[in-house]
Amino acid sequence: MENNTELILISISGLDRPGLTACITETLSHYDVDILDIGQADIHSTLSLGILFKSKESNSGNVMKDLLFQASELGINLRFYPIKPEEYQAWVNMQGKNRYILTLLGRKLNAQQIAGATKILANQELNIDGIRRLTGRVPLDERKSSVRACIEFSVRGTPKNKEELQSELMQMGIQLGVDFSFQQDNMFRRMRRLICFDMDSTLIETEVIDELAIRAGVGDQVKEITLRAMRGEIDFKESFKERVALLKGLDVSVMREIAENLPITEGVERLMFVLKRYGYKIAILSGGFTYFGNYLKEKFGIDYVYANQLEIEDGKLTGRYTGEIVDGKRKAELLQLIAQVENVDIAQTIAVGDGANDLPMLSVAGLGIAFHAKPKVVANAQQSINTIGLDGVLYFLGFKDSYLEERGIL
């Protein structure tokens, strides 16, 4: 840096109104200073503005005098901080460091949750560069169930132990009732293109095979097989075959009735509308049945459905299936196959599910999200949503409510 120049940081605060930044920068322009960095935030009409500039040493006194006079006229607070060249250079050198985004999400957020998350970041020697609210302004009436709160932290640095960081965030989320996502802030985070959903207990608030079993009068037997599978006594494929066999003789009209009355998960309509509007490819990868997946495909304009095909003869289920069983391994393979067909990098993919057989696709996707999931799934997922509806996925993708309001989506 030239010997006859100075680096000065000014910090400005006060009641925000149009024209403040214009007035300050116009004063600086009279002295031909170079703006090296600038940042501004507005919280409840209170301005916080910072400007780092380089000025000729001979001009510094006059610059500061005029700025103080300007601040007095505007009724704002202004402070100066001289910056040493070596401090500035150290700051410049940090620009290549890893960057991450921590997203906190819930019906509402409190100080304890934010303190817990930021303490974990600090213990991992990560620095917060910026904070922004993604959701709209929070009404004081907490009885409104649709209220959501989401804050996004821009974080810089290299975690001391990323696995430990992830584990601590997960435990904090469970204990304090807050959802989180911790992602690397790179080009892929802003360019996701393919999203794959499990169906049962994810897009819909039920397990279809349980509904079918109840109608067939074999509900208890099917539940027992499911419990055996969860205990690890039989694998998914074997449990699937046994459960399907018990559905033999069920009339197809029952399937139609169930499909027409599927309980759609909170937030699905909003999520699907936004994803389609922004050009995402959407897939259902389910260990359930194609009949119901195709119903949702027509309802929401979903692009791909891969599930299990029940065999039907003379309008009744035979107790058999056709084709390959879609288990956890197959889901991961299908996600990669669709990405290849759509010419999408695997880092641009998202997977969302609730069960153990979703873990393979959650692991292989660029962004894997456990949704209202079983404890084992939450413990092994990188991100989870447990407090709000499925449209919470939008905040993990960086969408702001204001973006959607502008387009009449909210």
Regions found by a protein language model. Give the residues of each.
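Active-site neighborhood of HAD-like aspartate-dependent phosphohydrolases
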Residues: 187-237
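Solvent-exposed alpha-helical segments within well-ordered globular domains of core cellular machineries
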Residues: 22, 26, 65, 69, ...
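Short hydrophobic segments within beta-strands
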Residues: 105-107, 196-198, 285, 352
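Long, charged amphipathic helices and adjacent flexible linkers at domain junctions
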Residues: 87-96, 184-193, 226-252, 316, ...
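A conserved regulatory-domain signal marking ACT and ACT-like small-molecule sensing domains
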Residues: 1-192
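Short glycine/serine/threonine-rich phosphate/pyrophosphate-binding segments
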Residues: 20, 113, 203-206, 358-361
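C-terminal cap/substrate-recognition subdomain and adjoining C-terminal extension
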Residues: 249-410
